[in-house]
């Protein structure tokens, strides 16, 4: 199935590209999330008329993402969690806790799906390096310091 991309999609293309994808990927992901439209003759003509407007909106989203990344990168965010002897946590610190801590400290809205934890959830006290995937091609490296809570 051919679709016209309305924004940059990782491993697929950029705004305005006409690409071939599997029908299920188009119907279940690209089209419902507003990332693409089916490449019919009418849609191609409509897209060409709106291309400048869409590029301007994409640039605004990208600039906002870069500003967010600059505001949160290279900082240390502290999360308090209950811990036992030896620094082992009761439970774990996951993406939701990291996203909440970064959002509260920076004032920028970060979703838990944007937090990248390559080694999985944090289960001990210490300082850990994580990545926040703000937007396509925009990542911010942060440090999370997990400390024992006073409980």
Swiss-Prot record:
Pfam families xref list: Ribosomal_L9_C (PF03948), Ribosomal_L9_N (PF01281)
SUPFAM superfamilies, sorted: L9 N-domain-like, Ribosomal protein L9 C-domain
GO biological process: translation
Keywords from the named record: Ribonucleoprotein, Ribosomal protein, RNA-binding, rRNA-binding
Gene3D superfamilies in alphabetical order: Ribosomal protein L9, C-terminal domain, Ribosomal protein L9, N-terminal domain
PROSITE patterns: RIBOSOMAL_L9
UniProt xrefs under PANTHER family: 50S RIBOSOMAL PROTEIN L9
Function: Binds to the 23S rRNA.
Family: Belongs to the bacterial ribosomal protein bL9 family.
Full protein name: Large ribosomal subunit protein bL9
Underlying gene: rplI
């Amino acid at each position: 199935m051919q679709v016209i991309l309305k924004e940059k999609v990782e491993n697929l293309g950029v705004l305005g590209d006409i690409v071939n994808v599997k029908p299920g990927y188009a119907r279940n992901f690209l089209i419902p999330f507003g990332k693409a439209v089916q490449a019919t003759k009418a849609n191609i003509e409509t897209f060409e008329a709106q291309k400048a407007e869409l590029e301007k909106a994409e640039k605004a989203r990208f600039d906002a993402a870069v500003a967010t990344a600059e505001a949160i990168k290279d900082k240390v965010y502290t999360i308090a969690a209950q811990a036992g002897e030896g620094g082992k946590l009761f439970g774990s610190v996951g993406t939701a806790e990291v996203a909440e801590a970064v959002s509260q400290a920076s004032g920028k809205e970060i979703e838990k799906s944007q937090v990248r934890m390559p080694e999985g959830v944090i289960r001990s006290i210490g300082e850990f390096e994580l990545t926040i995937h703000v937007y396509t091609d925009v990542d911010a490296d942060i440090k999370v310091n997990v400390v024992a809570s006073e409980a």
